[in-house]
C-alpha cells in the first residue's frame, strides 16, 4: 500500500485452546490494536475461547458453512467478509486449518501472513516456520512487527 503500512487487518483466530490463550493476550482482543480496523474470523466452536470480542467485527462459521473438505461453502458468509477490503490477512492457526487457509486463498489482500505448510507457501505472502522449541509469543510478536503494529 505505497509504503504506508496496513490500516485494516483480518485475523483468523486459532481453533486450539492453547493457541487461543496466547492470542487473547497478544492481540488484546478486549482492546483491539488502536488505530487499526480489525476483523476476526473463527468457528462457532472456538468462539468460547475468546470471551471479550464484543467490540470488534467478528465473523463466525459453523459446521453447516463447511463442505466435505472442511472449507467454507457458504456464499452468505463469504459475501459478509468480502464486503470489506483488508490490507492484511493473518492466520494465527499454528497448524493447517482447511477453512481458514482456503478463505485466505479466496480473499484479496496485499499481505497474507500464516504459519508454514506446503499449502500455505502457495497462498500466503509470508509464512513463518514453526519450531517446537520456540515460544508462540515470539511468532505473534513477529507478526505484529511485520504489520507495523505495536502492543
Located regions from the model:
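Active-site regions of enzymes building and remodeling cell-envelope glycoconjugates
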Residues: 52-63, 123-130
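Short, charged/polar "capping" segments at the starts of alpha-helices
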Residues: 18-20, 46-51, 122
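Short internal beta-strands
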Residues: 36-48, 115
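Histidine-anchored nucleotide/phosphate-binding helix
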Residues: 11-12, 16-36
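Glycine-rich, highly charged phosphate/nucleotide-binding loops
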Residues: 60-80
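Structural motif
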Residues: 8, 12-16, 42-44, 88-90, 92-94
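Conserved nucleotide-diphosphate donor binding/catalytic pocket of glycan-assembly enzymes
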Residues: 92-151
Amino acid at each position: 500500500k505505497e509504503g504506508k503500512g496496513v490500516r485494516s487487518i483480518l485475523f483468523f483466530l486459532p481453533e486450539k485452546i492453547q493457541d487461543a490463550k496466547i492470542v487473547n493476550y497478544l492481540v488484546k482482543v478486549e482492546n483491539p490494536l488502536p488505530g487499526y480496523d480489525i476483523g476476526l474470523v473463527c468457528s462457532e466452536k472456538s468462539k468460547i475461547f475468546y470471551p471479550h470480542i464484543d467490540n470488534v467485527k467478528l465473523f463466525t462459521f459453523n459446521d453447516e458453512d463447511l463442505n466435505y473438505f472442511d472449507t467454507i461453502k457458504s456464499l452468505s458468509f463469504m459475501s459478509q467478509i468480502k464486503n470489506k477490503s483488508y490490507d492484511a490477512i493473518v492466520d494465527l492457526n499454528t497448524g493447517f486449518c482447511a477453512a481458514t487457509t482456503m478463505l485466505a486463498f479466496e480473499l484479496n489482500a496485499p499481505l497474507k501472513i500464516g504459519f508454514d505448510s506446503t499449502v500455505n507457501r502457495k497462498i500466503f505472502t509470508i509464512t513463518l516456520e514453526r519450531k517446537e522449541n520456540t515460544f508462540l509469543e515470539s511468532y505473534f510478536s513477529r507478526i505484529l512487527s511485520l504489520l507495523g503494529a505495536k502492543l
